[in-house]
């Protein structure tokens, strides 16, 4: 009985825990938007950057996936030893910066490196989120928060498809757009 009492004391109060889960779900939604948006915008990107099918394949697959998968292990290790909210915050900053950098890509390698960094940044989220949920809820009450968090995996692609459709519609009707300080940008660049 004493272990159960100690275990319950380490959990956050209910409202703080649910706020944390909700924030992580929103981050998960954005992570999936970032993953899917490239695939939807690939035709205008391919045309503007003069990319080959092989380069497109590398951007859609290995550039993100290899780094996302391989960084998950060391980041999971770090999540067990360091402050998880700090790790996730740094990860969100890295992937947001890398996503924005995707919009400034002028060559294949620019976009490839940006996608690699998106993978590295996004790899922080799930190990930390699941660990935070584990710490924030007793074992018998973890199903709902994990379920809420993982809904981001379905909502994110839906949001990406909606945003991608809007950008593709815009791309077909707009030429270059002059942004003060940044100069001329294609509509696909603004999607990032």
How should these model regions be labeled?
Residues 113-153:
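Cytoplasmic helix-loop-helix junction between adjacent transmembrane helices
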Residues 44, 76-77, 166:
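Membrane-interface helix termini in secondary transporters
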Residues 32, 36, 64-73, 123, ...:
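Residue-level signature of mid-helix packing/kink "hotspots" within the transmembrane helices
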Residues 149, 153-192:
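Helix-loop-helix hairpin linking two adjacent transmembrane segments in secondary transporters
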Residues 70-109:
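Conserved MFS/SLC helix-loop-helix module at the cytosolic interface between two early adjacent transmembrane helices
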Residues 1-33:
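Cytosolic juxtamembrane N-terminal segment immediately preceding the first transmembrane helix
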Residues 41-70:
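Extracellular/periplasmic helix-loop-helix junction of adjacent transmembrane segments
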Residues 50, 83, 104-110, 121, ...:
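Helix-breaking motifs and short loop linkers at transmembrane-helix boundaries and internal kinks
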């Amino acid at each position: 009985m004493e272990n159960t009492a100690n275990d319950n004391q380490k959990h956050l109060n209910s409202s703080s825990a649910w706020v944390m889960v909700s924030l992580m779900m929103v981050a998960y939604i954005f992570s999936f938007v970032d993953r899917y948006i490239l695939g939807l915008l690939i035709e205008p990107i391919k045309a503007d950057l003069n990319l080959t099918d092989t380069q497109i394949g590398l951007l859609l697959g290995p550039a993100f996936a290899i780094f996302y998968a391989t960084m998950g292990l060391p980041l999971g290790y770090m999540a067990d030893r360091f402050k998880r909210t700090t790790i996730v915050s740094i990860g969100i900053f890295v992937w947001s910066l890398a996503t924005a950098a995707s919009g400034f890509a002028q060559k294949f390698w620019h976009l490839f490196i940006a996608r690699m960094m998106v993978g590295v940044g996004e790899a922080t989220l799930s190990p930390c989120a699941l660990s935070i949920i584990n710490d924030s809820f007793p074992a018998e009450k973890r199903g709902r928060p994990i379920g809420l968090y993982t809904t981001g995996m379905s909502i994110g692609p839906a949001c990406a498809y909606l945003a991608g459709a809007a950008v593709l519609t815009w791309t077909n009707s707009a030429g270059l757009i002059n942004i003060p300080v940044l100069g001329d940008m294609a509509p696909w660049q603004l999607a990032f």
